[in-house]
Amino acid sequence: MSTYPLVKFAFEVDWGGTKVGFQEVSGLNLEVGVIEYRHGASPDFSKMKMPGLTVNGNVTFKRGTFKSDNDFYAWFQTIHLNTVERRSITISLLDENGEPAVTWKVKNAFPVKLLSSDLKAEGNEVAIETLEIAHEGLTIENN
């Protein structure tokens, strides 16, 4: 076991065979819905609870906007052409040697929201684009 916990600023994203740099990745959550049930003859004054279906929340990616890089928009446009391109995406948290320590694998992802950077005449920051994806499952592996 390591002496120190992993830092969260060292990560890489495999975007369908291509490694892409991102400023931030969020939404790597696992959640299960809860089913509540109570029958009329129950002596308890509360509902019984049991696990239900898995809820797959969306994952959000943020990165700088680059000249001649229209990948997010091109992928988003496949929705409007009725030929949605689904991708498998792998996010890896890296250890001190740059090797994957924890890996999240996102299955059958497709874009649902694309946000361009806000523009400010007096701004002093990098233009950031944001892509939100829906998916059909997330697994976590400790390497």
Set out the residue ranges of the language-model regions:
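Glycine-rich, low-complexity intrinsically disordered segments
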Residues: M1-N143
